[in-house]
Amino acid sequence: MQSLTLQPISRINGTINLPGSKSVSNRALLLAAFAKGTTRLTNLLDSDDIRYMLNALTALDIPYRLSADRTVCEVEGRSGNITGKSGLELFLGNAGTAMRPLAAALCLGDNEIVLTGEPRMKERPIGHLVDALRQGGAKIDYIEQENYPPLHIKGGFSGGKVTVDGSVSSQFLTALLMAAPLAVNNTEIHIQGDLVSKPYIDITLALMKSFGVTVENHQYQVFYIRGRQQYLSPGQYLVEGDASSASYFLAAAAIKGGIVRVTGIGKNSLQGDTKFANVLEQMGATIRWGDDFVECERGTLTGIDMDMNAIPDAAMTIATTALFAQGETVIRNIYNWRVKETDRLNAMATELRKVGAEVEEGLDYIRVIPPEKIQHAEIETYNDHRVAMCFSLVALSNTPVTILDPGCTAKTFPDYFNQLKKLSEYTT
């Protein structure tokens, strides 16, 4: 296995232009495929998850043209359902942002299609989405294990009243919302349990609106969507920078700034993970906002105790930032860390202990007490891009850190370690 040892960083300073958001990129690609007209997507993320979606569009005979650097994509929309040939098998890696929305989208047709992925994808639950799609008439079979991919989809979703459990993943609701306008009947979606990651639903609703479709949202409990609608291409769509990816650079500035300015997101961003900057501010950093940037300056950091259900991906960065804060930090209401690319609660607790932290891992929370001195460790990354990027922050101590399988950042940010190095100053 490859490894990368990061030497201690004495100071972080400069400007970073963010790659496009994974969440926005894959939603925009699918809506562009549904839409009437050609859509030019700019600042598209080039990463593994996006490539899986693009490969799926190719297999589904949706024409698109990609720029040489893969950040501009012109998609010729289908003016409705995307069906694909019967007997097609789509391999979607470990890309939840492709698997869940495509599962719903392909239920609108009547062809038989198999959706599968990497071994970890087969451990990520999809039963709540399948249950909801079946309530709307969809015919779906589990090929291996009940409630998990791979799926055998036979179409049949026609809308109606459906109930979906919102407590595990907001992607299930996102998938239903994006497919529902193309169903033959109106759809009424009722949410069971507490809806996690609400800001990701706001991203979905905002994107649908950009493509000409509105949804009645009754306090995130009931959603009403008219059937037989048509998505309309906005012509051009700029994908904002990835706010989750911004978290590492902002946290680095809070710990060892200098000042870091992150461009591509700003005070009016769609993404809930921009609220990560507010958490850093509560911990003691100085934050400044612009229309298309956020800036962080070093402060004396103190631990916090906070519900971070709304920003689950960026909350991981707080767990490693806690190593540099005074007092303990508790991150609460994050059960859905357990059903991401790996069991992130267990992974973060295990690796934080390696560098010397005292950690309590609960069912849906993590408590971190920083060590007096951070220890050098080899960090297992569990093929999880965010674990790798979170633990790069350990290099902001006086101790090196070794990241195993650093290439796993290709899922969302292939160039991450180079970008971090550009902002880093080292004591010689």
UniProtKB/Swiss-Prot annotation:
Highest taxon of the lineage: Bacteria
Pfam families cross-referenced by the UniProt entry: EPSP_synthase
EC number: 2.5.1.19
Compartments (UniProt record): Cytoplasm
Chief site of localization: cytoplasm
GO term, biological process aspect, one: amino acid biosynthetic process
Transmembrane intervals: none
Covalent S-S links between cysteines: none
Binding site for phosphoenolpyruvate: K22, G96, R124, Q171, R344, R386, K411
Catalytic activity: 3-phosphoshikimate + phosphoenolpyruvate = 5-O-(1-carboxyvinyl)-3-phosphoshikimate + phosphate
Cellular component, GO annotation: cytoplasm
Binding site for 3-phosphoshikimate: K22, S23, R27, S169, S170, Q171, S197, D313, N336, K340
Listed InterPro entries: Enolpyruvate_Tfrase_dom, Enolpyruvate_Tfrase_sf, EPSP_synthase, EPSP_synthase_CS, RNA3'P_cycl/enolpyr_Trfase_a/b
Catalytic site positions: D313 (proton acceptor)
Record keywords: Amino-acid biosynthesis, Aromatic amino acid biosynthesis, Cytoplasm, Transferase
An MF annotation (GO) of this entry: 3-phosphoshikimate 1-carboxyvinyltransferase activity
Oligomer and partners: Monomer.
Protein's name according to its UniProt entry: 3-phosphoshikimate 1-carboxyvinyltransferase
Organism of derivation: Xenorhabdus nematophila (strain ATCC 19061 / DSM 3370 / CCUG 14189 / LMG 1036 / NCIMB 9965 / AN6)
